[in-house]
Amino acid sequence: SPAQSSGKYQWEITIGAKTTTYYQMGLNLSPAAYSTGDQHATFRGDGFTSSSLPGSWSGTPPSFTEGDVITVAYDADASNCKFYKNGVLGPTFTLTSIPGNLNFGVWADSNNGYASYSLNAGQRPFSYPVTGYNSLCTTNLPDPTIADGSTAMDTALWTGNGTSQTITGLGFSPDFLWVKGRTEATSNYLTDTVRGITKYVISEQTAAEGTNSIRITAVTSDGFSVGSHTSFNENNKAYVGWTWDAADSNTTVAKDANGTNLPGAECVYRANTTAGFSVVKVADPQSNEARVHGLSKKPDLIICKSTASSDSWHTYHSSLGYTKYINLNSTGAASSSNQFGSQEPTSTYFYVKSNTGSGANKSGGMIYFIWHAVDQYSAFGSYVGNGSSDGPFIYTGFKVAWLLIKNVDTSGETWTIHDSTRDVGNPAEHRLLPNSDGQESTGTSARFKDLLSNGFKIRGTSGEQNTNGETYIYAAFAEHPMRHARAR
């Protein structure tokens, strides 16, 4: 069961029979099966402890065997995990930092035997309750910051009428719109209220910003209007619009407003600090690094494009770090470069390379779409494929409404987008590609995945999502937090 990001929780493990040498349990970064190369903090049946997670063990670890009850008490706010044997405190592991989504697991110590365990997460009274700790169930999860994901990110579907129409029913007035035709080959059009909704950039192209008054013509309190352009409103054709809420008005931060080269260029932005999303326009990029993002936390995803000239889309992802980037408009693998400056983003600034020749800081103008993770609403991370139709499960803490995935190790694998509006049940099979103008496809079972109440599950073996041993980055947004979600 995944360790929560806040609160105090307990659960009990009753030790069963085994044929392997040792029982083993503990914390692990892998959402799938534990292996010796994973980052972990484990407690073994002979009393041995080990760790490759940042932190340390304290206390005296007892041995345990069949019939013993191990109580696990996890304090997310204090970043420690206590282990009790039959009600007596044993070892405690204290984390100095949390490098990813923690999981708790139980294992056998080899592939040549088995170890059995019985979990009590609160479905019956605990044998040894720990004062101040709650059972690990959805009722005891903390209240979410965003109780309904559709109030911050929403998906609209419509059928074209060939003239003009207004799309309604969103939970907000959208500030960032990503529109794609489903039933014919049309480009991915990205527009925003910071630049003005008649301006657009196309995610599968390197072309400069365009302007057209018959694509998106207006935004409303709960939607937007489209004109007669065939990429938005051809008669009887199907379309999807993915939308995000930023803010009601632009904020301008002058160059050097916060000190020398902070920021290094004037930044105009709209930011939704609650939902962790902002749109930043830099009309006159400078030969320095710092830019303001308007959010309260370090960004996890930055997608950017030169607006004045032809150039690729450069993407920062926190799982890759600032020394690497990947192009949204191509099937290429991640590349090492200084496109995102000489340091990681902070809670105030993001960084770009210090010259304006190309990429994430090209002269003439830049647009940046920026997100950070919000507990129970958005998640950004990575996973490693296993090449099996029983692929990795990735915990997000919410019912997934929208999912973006990309292989970062191998060239030739496409970006993919799935959402729960186009696929109301599992498996999710209707995919669209940010790096292609192709129409919606269902593909084969090798591309299937499940969008679940607490994450997503890879169901296919395609290289675009599950090559054995290769790394994939993802971005996911919530329909509802896990506390309020129901299975699809």
Task: Specify the residue positions occupied by each region the protein language model found.
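Surface-exposed molecular-recognition determinants
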Residues: 1-8, 16-18, 30-488
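Catalytic cores of Mg2+-dependent Asp-rich isoprenoid enzymes
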Residues: 11
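Conserved "boundary/linchpin" sites in short secondary-structure elements
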Residues: 21-22
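A sequence-level detector for low-complexity, Ser/Thr- and acidic-rich stretches
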Residues: 25-26
